[in-house]
Amino acid sequence: MEVNQDVSVREQIFHDWVRECIICSLLFSTLYLLSYIVITKFKKHADFATVDVEDAAVNRIALWMCTFTLAVSVGAVLLLPFSIISNEVLLSVPHNYYIQWLNGSLIHGLWNLVFLFSNLSLVFLMPFAYLFTEAEGFAGSKKGVMSRVYETTVVLLLLTLLVFGIVWVASAIFDDDSAGRESLYDLWEYYLPYLYSGISLFGVLLLLLCTPFGLSRMFSVTGNLLVKPRLLENLEEHLSCTAFEEAAISRKISTKASCWLNLNMEALQKRLLAIQSHRITLEMRRRASPWQRNLVYPLAMLLLLALTGITVLIVCVNVLELLIDEAAMPKGIQGSQLGKVSFSVFGSFGAAVQVILIFYLMASSVVGFYSSPLFIQLLPQKQNTPMTKIIGNCVSLLILSSALPVFSRTLGITRFDLLGDFGRFNWLGNFYLILLYNMMFAGLATLCLVKKFTWAVQAELIRAFGLDRLPLSVKKIRSQGKA
């Protein structure tokens, strides 16, 4: 009887493992397909349609690696929201037959896979893809893809030895454990997590710089996508003037007599493109319904303001909790705690707000990253992004997204504890570092918003009432906006 029970238990464990493998494979296949579609929208087709078959093959292999990395990035973004939603589902319907596949073992497996694939992409795939696209083969060797593979492998091996040597020296300096200094064989259990801990710390610091700036930029980006209300504006007259100006500049560019005149054709082309863009915006506003013109934009601004205010408020409350209770410190857990208790005081509603805030912070960090002067050159262009820039974008997004769970837990956006190796980072136990990080985020976010709304709100009100057409007002607003 005991033998039969033991066999049934082992069969159940095996079936659960197979089910988890199938679910993880389906999820990753979906993310890989979506990532491939996104990258093909931005890649430069000339890199893949070249006459040189060897270069085209190299670019295809690099494209597959970039697609894998981008899929891991999307998975890292979805990791914490999926875990929070799964916990609430298990709390609501714990014994439902159709959600038996959703359990703590699956969630832990997803966290471990994201951690593993993030290490694989950052340490091996992306460096290999970049070196592979730049390789030409050793001097005197036979030309071909394999020659590039050999050169890339040798260079990557030397680079890996250099990086792990630096990691070993850093761990010997900052770690008091003497066994850690003496052992180089414990690569998987110690040095890879230590290296990823440093990368995660860099990603969290990058989020600290990009997210507050992105929170203020979100208002401008949303305003460019929506139709803004204009209370005292004659739209038809404005459209007519823009059309006349566009026709006049087009005539100057296309006329045969322009070659005899001292005209800056490049400046005229730029001016024409700006006027055409402005005309398209005006036509979109004319086609918009009154509800869309006068209601959608204010509601969107209020929603962004509410999300930003809630985020800053949660961070301020988290600072107070850090000073009072040690339980507010981010930590990792190894046991399965899913479906036991809600990680929000407000239950399912609070969990939904947490998920929305996590996605909002990630979107703000991406907007802030591509809007910053340091990284604006990485901004991809549709159908015109070279492979090296695609690799840089994939690495940047992976660093930001893999740091998102730690970032959200550090700021107190959620109380969902970090699972797997994400909770093993040594710097998460440093109280002063966590406290300073929260205070800096709250201060930077508040400073960016105050600076944004000081002149932006005034300028929007003046434009809404049509006062920007006054010459003095235009000069004053523009000079203040540039300052």
From Swiss-Prot:
Cell membrane found in the keyword field: yes
GO MF annotations in UniProt: transmembrane signaling receptor activity
Keywords carried by this UniProt record: Cell membrane, Endocytosis, Endoplasmic reticulum, Membrane, Receptor, Transmembrane, Transmembrane helix, Wnt signaling pathway
Cellular component terms (Gene Ontology): endoplasmic reticulum membrane; plasma membrane
Single Gene Ontology BP annotation: Wnt signaling pathway
UniProt-annotated location(s): Cell membrane; Endoplasmic reticulum membrane
Extracellular side: 1-21, 82-112, 175-194, 316-342, 408-429
Cystine residue pairs: none
Pfam families tied to this protein: LMBR1
Transmembrane segments: 22-42, 61-81, 113-133, 154-174, 195-215, 295-315, 343-363, 387-407, 430-450
Membrane-related topology note: Multi-pass membrane protein
UniProt keyword Cytoplasm, yes or no: no
Cytoplasmic compartment segments: 43-60, 134-153, 216-294, 364-386, 451-483
Family per similarity comment: Belongs to the LIMR family.
Subunit architecture: Dimer. Can also form higher oligomers.
Entry function: May play a role in lymphocyte development by negatively regulating the canonical Wnt signaling pathway. May act as a LCN1 receptor.
Stated name of the protein: Protein LMBR1L
